[in-house]
Design a protein with these regions (language model features):
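Active-site "gating" loop of Rossmann-like NAD(P)-dependent oxidoreductase/epimerase domains
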Residues: 33-53
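NAD(P)-dependent short-chain dehydrogenase/reductase
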Residues: 65-112, 118-119, 125-126
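Glycine-rich Rossmann NAD(P)(H)-binding loop
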Residues: 106-111, 139-148, 196
Length: 220
């Protein structure tokens, strides 16, 4: 499916970025931690070398290159582990499983920053406004929730905040094979975004509380 992924994640952003350049409109493009290979145990900066592990990461990296090549005022925002009250995501999956399970095995050696979709949207607007007014340089930035955590740790917080009594057993990635390889290290260094635009990392635990309230799943 890499050809389809490339159309969606590279060709479409290229067309949008070119249109924005022609109209002198700032363009904010959302990318992913999957452009990295997940090696090491430190946070990756926007300037670190990329090495995607699979088709998704390659298509997103191609999209980044296309947006930059359009030559306009742009910001590429790499983020990770996105969750919200809408669509399919880890939070909603955990809540669904908690309805029928009292214990779960969750990967504990993948580390990253869960990021509320609402905070990503607000950040995109702030960046676009800054670029429109001539403040803030174009380029690649990272934006992810804090503090960094494993999927297992994320699950425990979901169950704690929602009042679900579900035991979480840590397992390694190799015990939970997936069709697409996932990075072990999804930590993103977000200091350049805060320096350029004054936007700090969001506390994902606060974002989780808002999502659970929106879903009607918060602990009473």
């Amino acid at each position: 499916q890499e050809a389809i992924a490339t159309v969606i994640n590279a060709d479409a952003p290229a067309a949008m970025a070119e249109a924005c350049t022609a109209l002198d409109i700032p363009f904010v493009h959302i990318s992913t931690d999957y452009v990295f290979d997940g090696s090491g145990d430190t946070a990756r900066s926007p300037k670190d070398a990329t090495a995607p592990l699979g088709a998704y990461g390659r298509s997103k990296l191609a999209g980044e290159a296309a947006v930059a090549a359009a030559g306009g005022r742009f910001a590429i925002l790499r983020t990770s582990w996105v969750f919200s009250a809408h669509g399919n995501n880890f939070v909603k999956t955990m809540l669904r499983l908690a309805e029928t399970r009292d214990s779960l095995t969750i990967v504990a050696d993948q580390i990253g920053g869960p990021t509320p979709a609402a905070d990503i949207a607000a950040t995109c607007l702030k960046i676009a406004d800054a670029l429109q007014s001539g403040h803030g340089p174009t380029g690649v930035y990272h934006y992810a929730g804090a503090p960094d955590v494993s999927w297992a740790g994320f699950a425990r917080e979901i169950f704690a905040q929602s009042g679900r009594e579900v035991a979480v057993q840590d397992i390694p990635t190799y015990a939970y094979p997936t069709p697409a390889k996932r990075p072990l290290n999804s930590r993103l260094d977000c200091t350049e975004l805060e320096t350029a635009f004054g936007i700090p990392r969001p506390d994902w635990r606060a974002g989780l509380s808002k999502v659970l309230t929106e879903l009607g799943a918060a602990s009473s």
